[in-house]
Amino acid sequence: MDLKELFDLNLCLRCTGRIFAAVDTGLTNEERGARLYFAYKSIYGERDVPESCYLCNGVFKKFDEFFNILMSKLNNYEFNSILVGSTFDENIIEMEKDIQSRFGSKGESIKKEFNREFGKYLSKRLGKPFSKDADLTIEVDALYENVNIIVKPVYIYGVYIKKSRDISQTRWIHKTGESIESIIGNELRSMTGCENYYLHGSGREDVDVMMLGNGREFVIEAAMPKRRYIDLYELQLRVNASGILFIYNLSYSSKATVRRIKSELHEKLYIAEVTGDLNKDIKKACSKFNNLIIEQRTPLRVINHRSDLVRRKKINYINIISIMNGRALLKICAEAGTYIKELVNGDNGRTVPSLSSVYGSQLQVSSLDVVKIYRDD
């Protein structure tokens, strides 16, 4: 190593020591730089070493300033752990890489050191531990000397039962009216002070379909919550007071739970009220669907916002519960993702076969309920 070339870079001791962070472990970069300077001085004599330099611009001496900016933005956010990230001028990053390559590329980046050292500083001042899965992430912009915060969302798992034919699962962008998402989310916002909320459902039912039986799994996400720990039973009581939506089995969860409920596919049991010119032949038509594979092209009613694909779905059975006055009550068990209304009406030939085509007369679903989702509870 050419010590003269090294100190001719005119870096501060911290930035000098960081060039060799992987060589002499057990020391801080500043201590490592001081040792290198001692070696230089013993050969070449005294020289001025800048306290700050063009590489770090004194950023490691600005922790108190960054802390004050952070405190002005915390606004009573509740958190138990922290993580620090940072951004530096790309020119600084490239300059550092170039310098380190000249001396064997055995150092660490300024970002890595800053995140570590400012993280230790914050952990001590805030009394909160460091975590890779932190409640609060602090992002420092070293170039513009600013601090931003990212609050980890709160995820709450539950199961809902919907006893209404007038509410959608999620909010519509350009429409008003209640939804499962808004009924739960507005109460969640009131209790957590979150900026927004998002419902993640394990599948969905149409607006006019009731979700009964053992209910549908969901996760409600509170974005940028001020309060992380709330009484989940109180949330349940508030939502259930609506009289049309009932939630239960609430527990804190995570993004992994969202992925799980989104990926799992479960057979479902439906009760459908069907109208048409009904006679005794409907029983024979229903029997044709025992363990039958049908083909469904994306229904016309949803074609504007879903891909036009043909999907093969298994129908386990269609059983008749009762027939009276031109109405039949059917019990239908089918694979996840089956369009039940189209299974009955045929959707102008886009579902083949349909109950209407097998029966030989047009049938329509006048009401539909999901009464069971076959999952491992």
UniProtKB/Swiss-Prot annotation:
PANTHER family: TRNA PSEUDOURIDINE SYNTHASE PUS10. Substrate binds at residues 270, 339. InterPro entries: PsdUridine_synth_cat_dom_sf (IPR020103), Pus10 (IPR005912), Pus10-like (IPR039894), Pus10-like_C (IPR048741), Pus10_THUMP_arc (IPR055174). The keyword Nucleotide-binding does not apply. Responsible for synthesis of pseudouridine from uracil-54 and uracil-55 in the psi GC loop of transfer RNAs. Belongs to the pseudouridine synthase Pus10 family. Its EC number is 5.4.99.25. It comes from Picrophilus torridus (strain ATCC 700027 / DSM 9790 / JCM 10055 / NBRC 100828 / KAW 2/3). It comes from the Archaea. This is tRNA pseudouridine synthase Pus10. The gene is pus10. GO terms for biological process: tRNA pseudouridine synthesis. The keyword RNA-binding applies. The lineage of its organism: Archaea, Methanobacteriati, Thermoplasmatota, Thermoplasmata, Thermoplasmatales.
